[in-house]
Every structure is written in structure tokens, then in C-alpha cells.
Amino acid sequence: MPPGVSTITLQGIDLQVVRQGTGAPLLLLHGGDGPQDHLPFLQRLTEHFEVIAPTHPGFAGSPIPEHFDTLEDLVYLYLDLLDALDVRDVVLLGFAMGGWLAAEIAVRNTSRLARLILVDAVGIKPGNRDTRDIADIFAAPAPAVARLLFHDPSRAPDLTTMTEAQLTVLASDRIAHAMYTWEPYMHNPKLRYRLHRITVPTLLLWGASDGVVPLAYAEVYRDMIPGATLVVIPEAGHLPHMEQPEVLLQHVLSFAAR
């Protein structure tokens, strides 16, 4: 097992958790692209925080628990994790699907949280049933997905250079991502009516070129959370931790220090 990675058993699940760095605790919830794409940014965060970064069950080759079938299962798993670690004044940082997860945690219980940061989060549906608020990344071909995810599509991983093992992990990540987010697609229709319960300072960080959930979506999200602030990151798409990591880091540090 790599340094800094431990296994914590919760709900009968052997949860892999990275715990590295010193400073205020920061719980990092990765997006649907899997934990591996967040590792470089995670390492930068460890220079300033005690980072706690679980791998969502089903990602990175881990099994999906038999009793898991919705994102809500992750919500209660991570509420249990916060209790088990007995951490307080936590900065909760979530990316994309992980941002939705972070918002769901915060509407239930903020007693262990100090601040909430949502990076290009999904989770709400501003429009009606017939409105496509969130791009369908599961149906689109790879080149189209790259254009949705990246300001510069050439930054997208080249599948032709991946090993069979890497492709296997990618496929299992995709299955887990779909299981957590497919029905209803990438949102909880009740979340918008609960966001007023968030009582900690909240920052939304958004790539200016996000093709999955555009800026208009971010503005609606911001307006639903009391006192929330939205900061737009230029030359970044849905994954600013990959395209503009230093800019993203500075915004996280500035907000956490307030």
C-alpha cells in the first residue's frame, strides 16, 4: 500500500483513505474521473493541509458494496468517516460528482465543517424535465467528451497510450460513476430545496469553459446557497485541477484562510 494510504472499515466496507500533510483538515472528494487524476493537486494541498482523501467504493479497482446503489450511500459513508476520524473545522472540497456529494453532506450536517468548496459541481437541475442542464458524457464519443471537459481538448488523456490495466481501471471507474449518477442523471431533484440548510461559508470555483455544467448553471447553484461566492477560472473546463492547478490552489488557500 502506498505511503499515506490506510484502510478504514466502515459499514463493513474497507475504505481506502489517503491521509497526508499537516495543517487544518481538508476532506477531498474526487470526481467521476477517479482519484488518480487528482493526485498531483492532492500533493500540492498536502503542503498546506492535512488532506483526507477517500477513494469512492467502485473506483480505482475497488469493489462496489452490495448495499450501494445511489450517491446517498456515499453521503452517509463519509459522514461516518468524519465521525470515525473525529476531525473538526474541516474544509470540505469536492470536484464535479464529488462536489455534489459535498453539498449533500453539508445539507445534512455541518457540525464538523468549517468551509465548503465546490469545484464544477453537479447535483442540481435548474430547468424543467425537458431541459438538458448537464451534458451527457456517457453517450458522447471520446472527442466530444474531451471538448466538454477541457478548455484545451489536447489535455485529455490519450486512451491509445494506456496499458490494459489502466483501461480496466478506467472502465470500472465509468461503471461506478454511472451507478452513482445515472438515475436521475447527475442530480438529486430534492437538493435544490435543501441547499438553504448550508450554514458554513461556501465557495464555488468554476472553469470558464466548462461544457458539462456551464457558468449559468454555476450561478443558479451559487444563488441557492446562502452567502455563497462564485469565482470563475479562466482557460479551464470541467477539470480545473488538471488545467489550472496553481490558480485553483491559490483560490482554495485564500478562502480557507479567511
Name each region found by the language model.
Residues I52-L93, M242, Q250-L253:
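Active-site loop/oxyanion-hole signature of alpha/beta-hydrolase fold enzymes
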